[in-house]
Every structure is written in structure tokens, then in C-alpha cells.
Amino acid sequence: SSRDFFRAKSMLTEKPKLFHSLLEKITKASIEYVKLQIASGVDVVQIFDSWGGALSMDAFWDGSAKYMNQIVKAVGDNIPVIIFSKGSHDKINDLKNIGGNVYGVDSSVAISKFWDDLGGEFAVQGNLNPDFMSTTPEDVKEETLNILNEFGGRNGLIFNLGHGIKPDGKIECMHALVETIVNYNKDNHLTESTLPQ
């Protein structure tokens, strides 16, 4: 589909039987794939939903979340499941009802607000804007510290980008990100570098 998911949204409203039949097939295949991953020894699985934010509040459950919920139910308590639904931070109740253990969030909202909105019941993953990976190591370090400090004393943060690394991402920026996180402690300051140079 397109970046605004026009064709997919049109199918949802104009041909709902076809839409749901397609998503049921994708969900069934995803469940089989996840079960194979678990059998192969993965420690966690992550479900990526790239279009949840394009859906209205009313359409989100039927058009996306219920299918993620089916995958989570199929996994059961075998391993943790991370749910990442891009742009869906305003759909908290439906997100929680998916049943994940961890919820990822993109960079469009403060990660502490997202954690608070989830009621502090779940770990969160995110949410450095991937555009920073194309800047300088100093910019990456500064923004990473801003996010870590803003998250404060809350528990349950898996630091990550708010979405994938872009092709123009710089290796030195990635190194700065990892080094900043590894050397950060909850007293809001950096400790001496432990990474090889």
C-alpha cells in the first residue's frame, strides 16, 4: 500500500470481507512463524504494526489490534512479546488489550508519558528519533541523555530507536548511542566508558 495506507483503508471500509480474510491468513502465517522462532530458541518476539497510527480509534481494534492479540494468545506464556504499533500511542486501551508484555513507541510522544498512560504496568521500548543517527555523535549523546533523564526513576525501559535505522545512519552515531546507554546510570550521569574504542 502507499505511505498513507489509502488502499488498505479503502479495502477495510469498501471490501471488509476481503480485508479480514487477508488479515486472517497473514495472522495464521505469523503465528506459525512465531512458533517456529520460539522452537528455535528466541528469547522474545516483537510484533510490528506499521499502520495502526493511520487507523481511527474506532477502526484500530478490528483493523489491526485484534490480529496482534491472536498472535499474543497463540504465544501464550512461553516468552515475552513486544508490541510496536507505529503512531498508536493514543490508543492506549486497545494497546493494553492486545496482551503484550512490552510496548514500543515511536518518537512522536515522550516515552515517559507513554509509560504513564499505560499505567506503569508494562515495560516500554523506544524512542530516539531515527533521524538523529544521521547527525553527529554529540547530538545523539545529548538526545539520548534527554530521553533517559526525562524517563527518570521509572522502571522498565528498553532503549531503542523510535523506528528503524535509515540508510544514511552513521556508524559513529550508533556507537555513540550504545556507549551513552551502557555508561548511563539512574543517578542521571555518565560513568566512565566501558566500551572498546
Q: Where are the regions that the model predicts?
A:
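Active-site loop segments of alpha/beta catalytic cores
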Residues: 1-197
